């Protein structure tokens, strides 16, 4: 039997998220109103050579539980297994994002330097924009070199809310 991509919706305080799992791993946590959401779903279908089915899975239920804890300010790290789908460069950038600690921020320039490509700031920004696993791969922690909030798939309001959640002391 072919594996399918299970898909569910999660309603967060910052907006609606689309969650998807494949082979017992989370492969999507994207904002429903993200202009690139459909592109991210198509990339998964094409790469995994399968289709979506609106059905839950143990991974999706655990993701929802951990997101609930995160939004309540009771979770600083996620333990969900991830299935990343992207180019080698995107995977390199996303793995670097996973190193950004809860409550911390970094810049696109710092990410480029950390992966050994200091002149690839725009390419890094593009890879971050293609991240289909928001929050768990914390692209919201990337800000401008001047400390300004810059683009985010969930919108700047959601980005600000996520950063505020992470800077509250509990």
For each of these PLM feature ranges, what is it?
Residues 1-76, 144-170:
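Low-complexity, small/basic-enriched stretches
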Residues 86, 90-94, 121:
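Short, leucine-enriched amphipathic alpha-helices that occur as contiguous helical runs
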